[in-house]
Amino acid sequence: QQAYFPVPFEALQGRIDFLAMDKDHRIGNAVIRTMPGVHPGGVTIYRVDYRGAAAVFCTDVELDLMLLSGGVDQPQQGRSFPPELLRFLHGVNVLVVDCQYTDELYLQRRNWGHPSVGTVVDLAAQSQVGRIFLTHHDPDHDDEVITAKIDDAALRLSMLSPHGLVHGAREGMVIAVDQ
C-alpha cells in the first residue's frame, strides 16, 4: 500500500503474474518494450510492435519533468526531449497519452505526475507519431474544456508537423493500430 494507491496489494483478486520487463519480450508476433517514466511512486511506458505497426501507452507520466530544456515556464525555448524517449516513440502509429493539464494549469500542478498538453504535442511532433489519443483528463474539466484542449492540441500539431492527427480518447473506444 502506497500513498498514491490506497488499495493493499493483497486485496486484489484474481491471478496476477509478474514479468520482469528489463528487456524486450515477445508474445507471438508482438514485441513489447518498456521504458521508465516520471510519476510519484514510479511508472512504466509501454510500446507494442506487431506486424509492422506500433502503439505506445503512456499515462501517468509527467513528461514535462523528462524535458532536457524548455517547457511551459520557458516558452521561448523549444522543448527538448531525451534521445531515448524520442527513439522509443519514433514513428509509432498510435500514442495513447495522458493529457491532464493545459499548459497554464500545469504550472500549478507540477510534480503531480501528469503532463501539459503542449509538451505532449511537441513530443508527438518530434517523434513523428501518426495518431495521438489524449486521455486521463483533469476530473475538474467538463466536456467543453476537454474539447477545447483537444482542438488546441490538433492546431498546435498541425503547425509543428506535416503528419499526425489528434483525437480525444473515450471510454469504450477501440483503436485500430495499422500501418
Regions found by a protein language model. Name each.
Residues Q1-S69, D142-Q179:
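Binuclear metal-dependent hydrolase catalytic cores
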Residues L65-G164:
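Cap/insert and terminal regions of metallo-dependent hydrolase folds
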